[in-house]
């Protein structure tokens, strides 16, 4: 690898804006905002809108929408649906 061309990889705290959930991970992302972590060190804080703590897929609150197929739309259009 060439020296001096790669971004700095360092630990960063990511915070879910919706829930306040925080986790630490390695990243090249940086921020002027910092936060003191559980180990007593200060790390850059990056706010994210959605994380595994608030995303419906991971929380189990996912809504499944059933899109009508072509046959269902045809039946509705011509009044052939069974109700």
Swiss-Prot record:
The keyword Repeat does not apply. Gene3D superfamilies: Ribosomal protein L31 (4.10.830.30). GO terms for biological process: translation. GO terms for cellular component: ribonucleoprotein complex; ribosome. GO terms for molecular function: structural constituent of ribosome. It comes from the Bacteria. InterPro entries: Ribosomal_bL28/bL31-like_sf, Ribosomal_bL31, Ribosomal_bL31_B, Ribosomal_bL31_sf. Disulfide bonds: none annotated. PROSITE patterns: RIBOSOMAL_L31 (PS01143). Keywords: Ribonucleoprotein, Ribosomal protein. NCBIfam families: L31, PRK01678.1. PANTHER family: 50S RIBOSOMAL PROTEIN L31, CHLOROPLASTIC, LARGE RIBOSOMAL SUBUNIT PROTEIN BL31C. This is Large ribosomal subunit protein bL31B. The lineage of its organism: Bacteria, Bacillati, Bacillota, Bacilli, Lactobacillales.
């Amino acid at each position: 690898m060439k020296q001096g061309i790669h971004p700095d990889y360092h630990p960063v705290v990511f915070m879910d804006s919706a829930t306040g959930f925080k986790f630490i991970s390695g990243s090249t992302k940086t921020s002027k905002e910092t936060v003191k972590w559980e180990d007593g060190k200060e790390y850059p804080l990056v706010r994210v809108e959605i994380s595994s703590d608030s995303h419906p897929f991971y929380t189990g609150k996912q809504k499944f929408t059933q899109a009508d197929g072509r046959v269902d739309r045809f039946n509705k259009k011509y009044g052939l649906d069974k109700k």
